[in-house]
């Protein structure tokens, strides 16, 4: 999809290659399309071809560990926000892929799934209050979606919000990504996005690109650079 081993050197703002928003040429990468296993290493061999297209930002579909309970094998069913899906490779291999992208003048953003988790995420047992519940206390899927493989998160819980932001910071500070494409952003309250984007942009010496999947105008007030809605295709 297009849209308008050793100690790793920390990426700083001066060394980032992030393009201006109006100059973004974005390429979506589904790792499963590139390879059935070790996708990160395979993708690294195709960066010249991607660069040849004029791409200056790559958006990776979710690369995180996915759940096994009620699964439909969707990459949007996150079991652990800080762990790599082993079918794609290791975190060190992904760090190297990010570095290779940067060397070619390509920024990297990650698909971020903030609306829900898998049913076997550790939070289900450790923090039931972090999830939306029905009248008798059962955790539920996102209402009206039919997404039965995932559990809906409760954004009225401040501790859950902080844990989510902490996980997002990990990928910027430890892995070196340049921002996020935030999945189903319209389902997540403005108050969280404002808190999250402000916290991420406060990370010293880093610039970020933030893309929201949604049509709400308040995404821009929350600090997103861009958004898009599927209504445009109708």
Task: Describe the predicted segments one by one.
Residues 167, 173, 183-234:
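Active-site-proximal helices and loops of the catalytic beta/alpha 8
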Residues 109, 179-185:
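Short catalytic-loop micro-motif centered on adjacent basic/acidic residues
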Residues 8-41, 45-56, 62-175, 195-205, ...:
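Substrate-binding/active-site clefts of carbohydrate-active enzymes
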